Design a protein with these regions (language model features):
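Amphipathic, small/basic residue-rich leader segments at the start of a protein or domain
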Residues: 1-101, 119-127, 134
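N-terminal glycine-rich flavin-associated loop
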Residues: 97-119, 148
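Glycine-rich phosphate/pyrophosphate-binding beta-alpha loops
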Residues: 145, 170-177, 262-266
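A short, Trp-centered hydrophobic/proline-enriched beta-strand micro-motif
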Residues: 131-140, 185
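Short Ser/Thr-interspersed hydrophobic loop/turn segments at strand-loop and sheet-helix junctions
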Residues: 58, 85-90, 186-189, 205-210, ...
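A short core secondary-structure module
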Residues: 161-162, 166-215
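A structural signal for short hydrophobic beta-strand segments in well-ordered beta-sheet cores
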Residues: 154-157
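Glycine-rich beta->alpha junctions and the first turn(s) of the following alpha-helix
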Residues: 2-6, 10, 213-291
Length: 291
């Protein structure tokens, strides 16, 4: 039906084999480790093991598009060619992390590739590409309709050689995860600019920065999505160096548009895979139940 490239077809075959051999047979083990872990948001041993296997087989950072292929030995796939891979990964909700293709890291890595300085890339992109750390993207807020990025209210104010952040964010994916090290935070730095698309700025806030408070975990439809999860956060006079800005003051909306587009496609493809797997499991249950 679709004419995928030879490279995409090769990865599809390899990924399907990996899922069959290493992922599907260990779903119950993953769940058992999650429930037995000391921390609800800790890094599970099975994930460490499976990531090493995926990296050895070259099933790593496959989301990186051709325009950014210089950042990886793998990937180099268009969204069209990557779509069936994302769909396959979505068949097991936690499996994208195995291949370093999990949100929000994929979008955040693209932000660093497209808009980060060489110093920012060395500090944050390199370990993200290696799967050594995780990251979060802090845009959504409780008091505004955050689907329109121009609505964000968190303030970002320059004070000497620092940015000062004050405000609240919530449903921030990965904020509680023990391997998360960096937040990309979007706020309003120039609220009186007549161009509403030039009012926003994005800055980097390392986890553990004074004034950055993780208030509580949040659920979606009753699920906490551990171990990654979602959190409510407060920024109380959080200070970071001016060099932590991405692309420049007033460029935050521009970054958001460049980041969120591909991510929405990836999410949709993964959800198609999850829906297909759910249907398959339901059909299997219907034909195999005895009571």
């Amino acid at each position: 039906m679709f004419d995928f490239s030879e490279k995409s077809r090769r990865y599809q075959h390899q990924l399907n084999a990996f899922m069959t051999q290493h992922i599907y047979p260990r779903e119950e083990e993953y769940t058992a480790q999650l429930h037995a872990a000391e921390s609800r948001y800790g890094y599970l041993p099975i994930m460490h093991e499976l990531k090493a296997k995926a990296q050895e087989q070259g099933l790593w950072n496959l989301f990186i598009p051709p325009s950014l292929a210089e950042f990886s030995d793998h990937g180099g796939l268009s969204n069209f060619d990557y779509a069936p891979l994302a769909e396959t990964m979505g068949r097991v909700l936690w499996s994208p992390e195995v291949f370093n293709c999990n949100a929000p890291d994929t979008g955040n890595m693209e932000v660093f590739m497209k808009y980060g300085t060489s110093a920012q890339q060395a500090q944050w992109l390199t370990p993200l590409l290696a799967g050594e750390i995780r990251s979060s993207y802090a845009m959504t807020e409780p008091q505004v309709a955050s689907s329109d990025a121009t609505n964000v209210e968190l303030s970002i104010v320059a004070d000497g050689d620092q940015w000062v952040l004050n405000g609240r964010k919530w449903f921030i994916t990965g904020a509680l995860y023990e391997r998360t090290r960096i937040f990309i935070v979007m706020g309003k730095s120039d609220p009186h600019n007549t161009n509403r698309h030039k009012q926003q700025t994005q800055v980097l806030v390392p986890k553990g920065t004074p004034g950055l408070q993780l208030i509580r975990p949040l659920t979606t439809l009753g699920y906490d999505d551990a171990p990654i999860g979602h959190a409510e956060m407060v920024f109380d006079n959080v200070r970071v160096p001016l060099d932590n800005v991405l692309l420049g003051a007033g460029r935050g909306f521009e970054i958001a548009q460049g980041r969120l587009g591909p991510g929405r496609i990836h999410h949709c493809m993964r959800l198609i895979g999850a829906a297909q797997r759910s249907l398959e499991l339901a059909c299997k249950r219907v034909t195999s139940r005895t009571t």
